[in-house]
Amino acid sequence: MFAAPNFFLSGASDSVGQIAFTTAGTYSWTVPFPVTSVSVVCVGGGGGIPVPSVSNGQDGGSSSFGSVVTAGGGGGANESSGAAGAGGTGTTISGNIGGGNGGAGGSSSGSGSGGGAGGYSGNGGAGVTTGAGNSGAGGGGGSGGSSGNTGAGGGGVGLLGEGSSGAGGTSSPTGGGGGSSGSAGGSNSGNGALGGAYGGGAGSTNGRAGGGGGGLRYANSVSVTPGNVISVVVGAGGSGGTSNAGTGASGAVRIIWGENRSFPSTNTGDL
């Protein structure tokens, strides 16, 4: 496997392979010969939490593959209104499509936990104000738990196809479980909790709301032309919390090609 700071590329030949972009930014991907059809999954970045008495949490960024697939980022929590971050959604305009929305963050009536990232066939778990978090569905991430004083981060979602959904975090609090082999959300440092990769929303503290999880969208049988260059955008996690301790996880984009490979789960692992 070839690895570079911003993406991971593997495959036995140009007719079968995959590439994953996992660092926030904009990339140019050249379609390899003789590839004429690909499947793509995009995950939006998770939303951040407020900096107390200073600013709102930032929204997570959208992730996209050309103009074909877009997964929206989770919303940042609002400092002035106390509104929780909304879960990310998304759009697809080509191919056999699917995906779920991110879970909304927990409200500010306690200290809201982060929402889980969307799954392949269901939504991420919604954040809570106090108590155990909610499990994700369809391979999505679970939301963090909340003690009522601090909320944990939402779980992210993996890129290798649909797997088990993430469990909700405990009221200790612990972060939501990652769905489809994604990463669990972070515990709370006292200044906030990080979302789990990819797309988990941040957990809050001091009576603030949590960030929303990023949405997931996939498309299959997307027609491409060898040698053409396609823009790939990976959305950043929304920053927030004191010293950025309450930042959502970044999004990601993964492209696969080869015979009989399609999301959510047909030969979607690395080949």
Residue ranges and their predicted role:
Residues 6-7, 37-271:
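Low-complexity, glycine/proline-biased repetitive segments and flexible coils/loops
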Residues 1-11:
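Short, intrinsically disordered N-terminal pre-domain segments
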Residues 1-2, 15, 23, 114, ...:
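Generic detection of intrinsically disordered/low-complexity segments and helix-coil linkers/edges
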Residues 10-46, 269-271:
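GGW-centered surface loops in extracellular recognition modules
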